[in-house]
Amino acid sequence: SDGKDLIYQEILPGKGWKTNELTGRMLKKFARSGIQISTGENTDQILSIIRTELSKKVVSLDEKALNRLENLIVALSEREMLQITIAKEDNVFLGGAFFIHFGERLIYLKSAFLEEAKKSGVMYSVMFDKINASMERNNIFDFGGSRVPTVRQFNRNLGGLDQTYYQFTWDNSPFWFKMIVFLRNTFFRQKISSIQKM
């Protein structure tokens, strides 16, 4: 352990989920935008935007990290744990978001949208819809962990409540963290095993 706490946000069903005024304004802006959101299977298109848009802004999203993300997406899809939300305007693809559904928890994984869509409030709308669906199903919505203050504020704008876990202590890690480590280890063991059999 390195002694650092990591904060993540989640919303529990039945606890009076509330968003703030900024979220309300962004949802109204989105409603006027003409952008439509729906479920989809546009994995490659979303990953392409992550590569071109996010990798410029996030130093840790190097080629190795992007390949790991792609492998994780494949593993989640094969296990029918992946949910994808996409955004389009006049049939033009604007981006999408990946979520993990496991038991009674929906976990935000990663998203990427073109800049004009983000300015129209698409991310607020996508997250709001997913949170609302989670609450209706009596599921926990988990935003995941981030050390980035603006990400934490965005999650809190949408009603996320801070939770703390100790970063490298397995027993106190949030459920999504344990699951991703398990899937990653399982996926790579299978890959190595199949390569050795060739």
PLM regions with names:
Residues S1-I35, G145-M198:
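Terminal substrate-recognition subdomain of acyl/acetyltransferases
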